[in-house]
Regions:
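A short, basic N-terminal segment
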Residues: 1-42, 47, 207, 211-234
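Post-Walker A helix-loop "phosphate-sensing" segment adjacent to the P-loop in P-loop NTPases
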Residues: 69-80, 89
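Conserved nucleotide-sensing/catalytic segment adjacent to the nucleotide-binding pocket
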Residues: 87-127
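Conserved AAA+ ATPase "sensor/coupling" helix adjacent to the nucleotide-binding pocket
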Residues: 148, 162-175
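Short regulatory helix/loop adjacent to the ATP-binding pocket of P-loop NTPases
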Residues: 131-146
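C-terminal helical "lid" of AAA+/P-loop NTPase domains
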Residues: 182-186, 193-207
C-alpha cells in the first residue's frame, strides 16, 4: 500500500455571472472623477447639448455613461452604424461609448450632432482622447466638437481604487480584510478594468482552494498575472 500523499481535489468554481453594479448608488467618487460625476448628476442642465467625457482606459467612463444612459433613457448608438440610429432617435438623448476607438464616422457623427441639437436633446460621447486629437478632417464636425463641453476623468487614485475593489468583492459577496485591499491598491495597475480582473481571479482561486482571500494569496495572484502581462493589457 503506497504512503504517497495526493493533493486534495480542487473545487471547480461555477461561473455565477457576477455582474458589476452600474447604478448611481454603487458609484465610488473621489477627486479623480468628481467633476465627471457632477456633470452626470446635473443632467439635463448641461452647459452644451454635446458633452465629451475623456479619460484613459479603466478610468470608469463606461460606468458613468451607463448610469447616465439609464437616467436619461438614452439610445446607445453603435459607432459603426451612427446613420442608422438617427431616423429612430426622435427627441431621446444619445450615447456613443468609446467613440474614438476606431476611425470616427465623421459624416454620421456630424448628422447625429445636428439631429440632437435640432431636437433640443443631448448627446454624451466617451473617448480616451480629447476631440482635438481624433484627427477629424470634416471642418463642420470639427466646429461642432469645439462647441461641445469636454470633461476629463483621470486614472483612479488610491481612494477610488480601494473603494472599487471593496465594492467588487461585495458584489461577489466576498469579505476581504482592508489590509488586503490596500495591498492590491499598491500593487496593481491604476485601472478599474484591471481591478475587475484581479478580483475575479482572486475569487476563483480562493474558491478552487477553499481558502479565504489573504494578503499571501493576493500577492501570489498578482505576481502570476504580472508574469502574463497580456492579462493586464487593456
Amino acid at each position: 500500500m503506497s504512503d504517497q500523499k495526493t493533493d486534495p481535489p480542487r473545487q471547480l468554481p461555477l461561473d455565477l455571472g457576477h455582474g458589476t453594479a452600474y447604478s448611481r448608488d454603487d458609484l465610488v467618487v473621489s477627486g479623480t472623477n468628481a467633476q465627471a460625476v457632477a456633470l452626470v448628476d446635473r443632467w439635463p442642465d448641461w452647459p452644451s447639448p454635446v458633452v465629451v467625457l475623456a479619460g484613459p482606459a479603466g478610468s470608469g467612463k463606461t460606468h458613468l455613461a451607463s448610469i447616465w444612459r439609464v437616467r436619461a433613457n438614452a439610445v446607445a448608438v453603435d459607432t459603426r452604424r451612427i446613420g442608422d440610429n438617427i431616423a429612430n432617435l426622435g427627441a431621446r438623448p444619445a450615447l456613443i461609448d468609446d467613440v474614438d476607438t476606431g476611425a470616427v464616422d465623421e459624416q454620421g457623427l456630424f448628422h447625429l450632432i445636428n439631429a440632437v441639437r435640432g431636437a433640443g436633446s443631448t448627446l454624451l460621447l466617451t473617448a480616451r482622447r480629447f476631440p482635438s486629437a481624433w484627427g477629424v478632417a470634416l471642418p463642420d464636425l470639427a466646429s461642432r466638437l469645439k462647441a461641445a463641453a469636454t470633461v476629463e476623468i483621470h486614472e483612479p487614485d488610491d481612494l477610488l481604487l480601494a473603494g472599487v475593489i471593496t465594492k467588487l468583492f461585495a458584489d461577489r459577496q466576498v469579505e476581504v480584510e482592508p489590509h488586503v485591499v490596500q495591498y492590491l491598491v499598491r500593487r496593481i495597475e491604476r485601472s478599474l478594468a484591471t481591478a475587475m480582473r484581479v478580483v475575479e481571479r482572486l475569487d476563483r482561486t480562493a474558491l478552487e482552494r477553499k481558502t479565504p482571500i489573504t494578503r499571501t494569496l493576493a500577492a501570489e495572484t498578482v505576481s502570476a498575472m504580472d508574469e502574463g502581462q497580456g492579462e493586464f493589457e487593456i
